[in-house]
Design a protein with these regions (language model features):
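Immediate post-signal peptide segment of exported/extracytoplasmic ligand-binding proteins
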Residues: 30-32, 41-93, 169-171, 175-181, ...
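Periplasmic-binding protein-like
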Residues: 80, 155-163, 214, 249, ...
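Extracytoplasmic small-molecule ligand-binding "clamshell" domains
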Residues: 57-138
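A conserved helix-loop-strand patch within extracytoplasmic ligand-binding domains
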Residues: 111-112, 119-122, 139-140, 152-204, ...
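Short helices/loops that flank or line small-molecule/ion binding pockets
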Residues: 103-108, 116-117, 121-134, 148-149, ...
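Bacterial lipoprotein signal-peptidase II cleavage site
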Residues: 23-31
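Extended ligand-binding regions for polar small-molecule ligands
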Residues: 54, 99-108, 165-168, 175-189, ...
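A ligand-binding cleft/hinge motif common to bilobed small-molecule-binding domains
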Residues: 121, 139-146, 194-197, 234-269
Length: 322
């Protein structure tokens, strides 16, 4: 097979991969526009008939209707796809460990779940702008986010590097990133880690480590969607793709003939949080109720069952306290 045919086959393969995670044509055929500074991208409504955990027998908390975006519903902002935590099933419904957790929280508050698919780097602005009640979207807890919202710990994950099968650029350590291209989603902690932003301001991040040592800078390639960064790796536009460990592991497990993890190079185990708007004087009713519902799930084992369903139980937490 000649090189042009190989490239075409590769592109078709990755298209099938991404489609398997986001198969709803209504959501995926038109790319989301990049918001201009100061603007919030309008969240895209997605179907909400996703499989949910079995109904609970009792409601553990309530939220006044006038505090909800839509009465009777817990509206969740999430950046889809980001499997296995949030993605679309074959029928175009949102699913994943984060989505199932959100559904069960809503259930325990006597509510139905609604999902708004929202660009990740505008997701906090969407919450603060009244587009949703909470965010469940694999958000790492950091100081910059805590200055804007309150966050309830619900998971923990590291950061991993995915490379093409055979690791053609021989990336084994962070030093090997110097002078190479790295694909990453905008607004993520991984992007901060590369650029020396957020919680990595003090150390300067991975790029500064290269330049301070007299080595070539990392060629950081930011993408609006995590799936775009994966596509860049598949089409050889970047040497590696930097993302949360559960997401990296998912893609490698699903397509072991195309991708592999950089063994032994998992960085920064960080807790992820459910984001809620800050209350005017202490925690809001939404924060208190969501926290109570989540802790009840942890205590009765439902939470761990959900994580185990998606093979991410290694990221389980035992408490909703920081």
């Amino acid at each position: 097979m000649n090189q042009s045919r190989i490239r075409i086959a590769s592109v078709l393969a990755i298209a099938a991969l991404v489609a398997s995670a986001c198969s709803s044509a209504a959501v995926t055929t038109a790319p989301l526009a990049t918001p201009t500074p100061g603007q919030t991208a309008a969240p895209t409504a997605v179907p909400t008939a996703a499989p949910t955990a079995a109904p609970t027998q009792k409601v553990v908390g309530t939220i006044p209707s006038d505090q909800l975006v839509v009465a009777g519903h817990l509206t969740i902002c999430s950046d889809i796809p980001y499997p296995p935590q949030e993605y679309f099933d074959a029928d175009g419904n949102p699913t994943g460990s984060d989505i199932d957790i959100g559904s069960e929280i809503a259930n325990r508050l006597g509510l139905k779940m609604a999902v708004q698919n929202t660009v990740f780097d505008t997701i906090i602005a969407a919450l603060k702008g009244g587009k949703c009640d909470i965010i469940i979207s694999a958000q790492n807890i950091n100081a910059d986010r805590l200055a804007q919202v309150d966050m309830i710990p619900f998971f923990q994950a590291g950061q991993s590097f995915v490379v093409a099968k055979g690791n053609p650029d021989a990336i084994k350590t962070t030093d090997d990133l110097c002078g190479k291209s790295v694909g990453v989603e905008n607004g993520t902690t991984e992007a901060d880690h590369l650029n020396g932003a957020g919680d990595y301001k003090t150390t300067g991040g991975l790029n500064k480590a290269c330049t301070s040592a007299g080595k070539a800078a990392i060629d950081i390639k930011p993408y609006q969607k995590d799936s775009d960064a994966l596509l860049a790796l598949q089409t050889a536009k970047v040497a590696t793709y930097f993302t949360d460990s559960p997401v990296a592991g998912y893609y490698v497990t699903q397509h072991p003939d195309q991708f592999e993890l950089v063994s032994g190079l998992t960085l920064s185990l960080i807790k992820e949080g459910i984001s809620v708007q800050k209350g005017t004087s202490g925690p809001s009713a939404i924060e208190t109720s969501v926290k109570t519902a989540l802790q009840s799930m942890i205590d009765d084992g439902t939470y761990l069952k959900i994580l185990t369903k998606y093979n991410v139980q290694s990221g389980a937490v035992t408490s909703t306290n920081p």
